[in-house]
Design a protein with these regions (language model features):
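Extracytoplasmic
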Residues: 199-238
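Membrane-interface helix-loop-helix junctions at transmembrane boundaries of multi-pass membrane enzymes
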Residues: 82-88, 126-142, 178-189
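Alpha-helical transmembrane segments at the extracellular/periplasmic loop-to-helix junctions
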Residues: 93-97, 103, 107-173
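Signature aromatic-anchored transmembrane alpha helix within multi-pass, membrane-resident enzymes
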Residues: 182-203
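Transmembrane alpha-helices and membrane-interface helical segments
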Residues: 28-35, 72-80, 124-128, 167-185
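Short hydrophobic alpha-helices at membrane interfaces in multi-pass membrane enzymes
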Residues: 2-5, 35-56, 82-91, 138-144
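Membrane-embedded helix bundles of polyisoprenyl
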Residues: 1-37, 47-77, 97
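Hydrophobic alpha-helical membrane-interfacial segments at the cytosolic entry of transmembrane helices
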Residues: 54, 80-100, 193-197
């Protein structure tokens, strides 16, 4: 929980407010699928009716968070857990398709190879360090790693936004795997080093984002006369 809180706070410091909102709905959708009460296990339609709107709200808040819900849906689909896959996957796809039809958009966000290194590395760490019985986590990390490579190779609107999933939840998966690793073995030490690296990565990236996204005081001061002149001539009226 603390590892997740650290990732979410770092995301807020970086200024990704709408993505944070979308992540809240995304977590709700995923929790609905995986934490559905056992006594209602046969009520699959009820589960879908709860998970799908949350997945849709996640995508409406932030298409990037909707994309990450889709990655979990793919992992479930590959395990032949089709009801959960459809519940999580169809709503984000419908929201994106409707948005593209109503509000056509174009352009791409560049993503250099350097931006892929750490997300790929931590996708590999999660795949390697979590227990082999955690199939959904391992498949999701593998699908995510492949997605990072595809986004780097193929220019799209996603770009470096794909890195956010590992920045939020790689630490959570690694911390969760720690109690299942034999202490003071090579794997345990490697896992601890990976966790320390994750904390350093997220801490540095958040501080860097905060520094570079804060408007300079001189910019605000020098812009004030121009804004005042525009207001006096009624520029806001067109």
């Amino acid at each position: 929980s603390l590892a997740g809180l650290f990732g979410l706070l770092a995301n807020a410091v970086s200024g990704r407010v709408t993505f944070g909102l979308g992540t809240m709905f995304a977590l709700g959708a995923v929790a609905t699928v995986f934490c559905w009460p056992h006594r209602w296990r046969h009520e699959r339609w009820a589960k879908a009716l709860c998970a799908a709107p949350l997945a849709a709200l996640s995508t409406m808040s932030s298409p990037v968070s909707g994309l990450f819900v889709g990655l979990v849906a793919v992992a479930l689909f590959l395990q032949k857990r089709r009801p959960g896959a459809w519940a999580l996957g169809l709503a984000p796809a419908a929201v994106v398709a409707l948005s593209a039809w109503l509000f056509p958009f174009s352009g791409t966000q560049p993503m250099g190879f350097g931006s892929t290194v750490l997300p790929l590395l931590y996708a590999g760490f999660v795949f390697a360090f979590v227990p082999s019985t955690w199939k959904t986590v391992r498949i999701t990390s593998a699908v995510y790693g492949l997605s990072v490579l595809l986004v780097w190779v193929i220019s799209s609107q996603i770009g470096s936004n794909i890195t956010r999933l590992s920045m939020l939840f790689a630490g959570v998966a690694l911390v969760a795997a720690l109690p299942f690793t034999v202490p003071r073995t090579r794997k345990w030490y490697a896992l601890v080093v990976a966790l320390a690296g994750f904390v350093g990565w997220i801490g540095f990236k958040s501080a860097d984002d905060a520094v570079h996204t804060t408007p300079a005081a001189s910019w605000a001061r020098e812009l004030a006369p121009l804004v005042n002149e525009l207001q006096e001539v009624g520029a806001e009226k067109g």
